[in-house]
Amino acid sequence: MGGGGDSRIPRLLREQFVGTDLRCIVRTYDFDPEIGHAQIASWVEELRPDLVIGESLGAIQALRVRGIPHLFVSPSLGAPDFLVRLAWVCKVPGGKALLHRIWHVKEGDRQPLRFEYEIMKKYGPHWADAKKAAAEGGYYYAFFGTHDHYRKSGVVKVSLWEELFGKTYTIYDGTHFMEEEYVYALLIPKIHEILDGPADVLPGECFFQIIVLQ
């Protein structure tokens, strides 16, 4: 939510994968979940990624990508319900401005947030479609921070993750925004574990594409 190409995790992954057979792709998609889903589906068809990483609210869009392994950082599975319940604020004078002050997007290659009643209400069926896609099976693994401030509000729910995917997660001693040390110590090794290619493939002969959704 409000992330993009110059966010921490995409930047670190791109830097780490320079000169390797891994390519990290980040594209900013629309805050309207249905427009965003259509954009992402088009990119997946174009790029044929080998792995999708969903961070924060981007986890819901990532769940709707079928047929490839999934990794998640601080998946905000409770966010759709939160946004639906908060939609009424958009109808109050000054409500939209208040939401933009609370969730201020940094300058740069970031997702513009559009707090509109109709858009926020769409997150209900968006979450239903994500759960339906996840129920079809696949590889799902998540990382949660012990000091994630969104866990108090229920936006991030480890218990809900367990309900859907079991104990397929690691909890690190950090925040919602995975610190650099854990990107190197946890996320990147897990990426290599999933995308461990054939030993006889020479460097430069094969590239693995990773798409990051935030």
Residue ranges and their predicted role:
Residues 1, 53, 143-145:
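Short hydrophobic segments within beta-strands
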